[in-house]
Amino acid sequence: MIRRVHGTTPTTTSTTSPFARIPTGPSSNQRHLVLIDTITGAISPKSVDASDTGLVFAQNMMYRHTVTVYDSSGNLVKTIPDTVDMTAFGFPGHPGITHGAPVEAAFTPDARYVYVSNYSMYGAGFGPEGSDTCTPSSAEAAGDTNSYVYRIDTRTLSIDQVIEVGLVPKYLAVSPDGKWLVVSNWCSFDVSIVDTATATQVARVPVGAYPRGIAISPNSSEAYIAIMGGDNVVTIDLQSLAKTGSFFVGENPRQLVMSPDGSYLYVTLNGPGEAVKVDLATDQVVASTYTGEDERSMAIATDGQSLYVVNYLSDTVTKLRTSDMSILQTVSTGVHPVGITYDAITGDVWVAVYTGQLLVFADTP
């Protein structure tokens, strides 16, 4: 059932919504997804991310050059253009107005700020648009230039920091202690480590071809990086800021999600279309399940009992039980679901459909 279809009229909301919670009643693995909202408008969402304080951000790439912000009820709060004056942020080599291309978002632990990666930058002093088939050498030959991460103040909903990272940054994550921002640079084959206190990149860690998903341990000691151009996950020590290891997970790992207690890592495998469960005590895959063609993003319920996976070419979302990775439900979406988030305020699941929709599913008893 569809409750309503939203247009683009802004409304107001408070960023001091209730704290994240586990919904009362049955656990998430005893609930089922029901479509309740379809949000349209001038959007082309690559990703969608809930703040868990009552806001949801959709990143609309270079197709719209915006980030659209909604409240947990699905009302549009603000459309944030990706335009900045780079000179005002301390980058005099890029005069005039610069556009970004918002890809993914990551909130600080208190949700006071959200960091947004930009696929490429468009303006004076920047090279050509990046590509998904680049390599460090081909990017250098083409004259590609580093991209930037924006920080957005979730109270004012305005960009207040611009941070240089690598070539075609995609995923990013903030450590639970709020100290580090970790960014995967797709074309640089490395990861940027940013000190959030100074908004400065302090390390670039080589990890392998096409790094994508990132998860960080609950104690903020270790970052896990999915190497989509391979079959492994790389570990980075967040004290030494160095690569410390690697373990096999399967072909083309894309998204990483960690269990609330940090015991297990869940991985989407883009090529095989499988979701796998890794025991982090042994770094071994202990379960896997096929969910659909061209598996992309994944989210986890607050109680840690369920996963939600989008299957890009199957046009579906699959819900899995984390204990045994069995399929609980598969629901249809629009064409090319690509992003997904779990809103801990409502227990709803939001799906970004690349062709121009956000779908909201209630996880109902």
Predicted regions and their residues:
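Predominantly soluble domains enriched in secretory-pathway, periplasmic, or organellar proteins
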Residues: 1-365
